[in-house]
Each structure stands twice: as C-alpha cells, then as structure tokens.
Amino acid sequence: MNIPYTVEERPDTGLANGKLGIWLFLASEVMLFGALFSTYIILRVSAVEWPHGELNVWLGMANTFILIASSVTMVMAWASLKMQDWAKHRLYLILTFVLAGIFLVNKYFEYADHLSRGEGPSHSTFLAIYFTLTGLHGLHIVGGMIVMAYFIGPGAKLWKKNADQFANRIEYTGLYWHFVDLVWIFLFPVLYLL
C-alpha cells in the first residue's frame, strides 16, 4: 500500500498533513521543556541559596548568537528552494549544519571544564538542572543535524523528483530548528544570567 504525499492544505485544519504533524510534535516538545522549566522554577524558588556565576556567560552568549545565525541560514535555505536556487539552498543548509556543530563543540568544552573541576550533575541541584536542560537541548541539536545531513546527502535526490515535497520537508525541518533555537533563547538567560 502506498499512501500519497500531499502538499495541499486540508479543509478541516487549513494545514498540510506534514505541517500539522510537525506542529503537534512541537506541542509535545513544548510540554517536555515546559515541565523541565517548571521544575527549575520550583527548585529555584524553594532553594535557600542558589549559585550564581558558575557558568561562562561569554560562551553562552556566543552560543546564542551562533544559534540565531543558524536560524537565519535555515530560513535562507528554505527561501532559496522557493526561488528554485538549489546551489544557495545547499550552501545555507550546510552553513546551518556547521553552525550547529560549532554550538555542540562549544558545549563540549563547557561540559569538559565543569567535569574537570568535579562539577558534574551530582555536584549541586543547579548543575543537575543545567546538565539536564542543556543536555536534552543538545540531543535536540543532534537530531536536527541528523535530519539536515540526510537532506544534504541522500535525501537531496528528492529535489529532482518532487521539488514541492522537498521544499515542504525543509520547511518542517526549519520549524523544528527554530523551536530548538527558541528553547536556547529561554535557557540562556535562565541558566546563565539569573
């Protein structure tokens, strides 16, 4: 049995099936990160003392700018597809992938610094929350990179077979990527600045 891929909007939702699916998935992700942020708030409010200044603010700020830049390159990748410019699309998608990799390398050095000083997740409640939230966020970055690698590599063949379908998949990947970036926009001030 072959289920046809449709790019038309459904009359009952006003969205194509793929877009509805990604929005439902992102809603579940909002609940996941919302629960973790709520836990953070409860633990922080109930704590007698809360550590401040344990994180490298400059590295966190650099990562913020890296992810914002990656959001821009992801939009440019999708917009290039809409303008039928395959070469620019590929360039922007590769740039997004590279920026995500730079973000993860920065996180690696940040984690290594903490762990070398014996400051692992069991060191304090703050660091347990920090490693949980940023680790889960990092896994989402890796997930996005896997999807991008697929579209840079073997999945790129779809462009020649069905350009609309390929552009839709890049759009849905972009929605996911913007969500991942938005999560970091919340994580940075909560963990690094407050």
Question: Which residue ranges define each predicted feature?
Answer:
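...captures the hydrophobic TM-helix bundle architecture rather than a specific catalytic motif
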Residues: 1-194
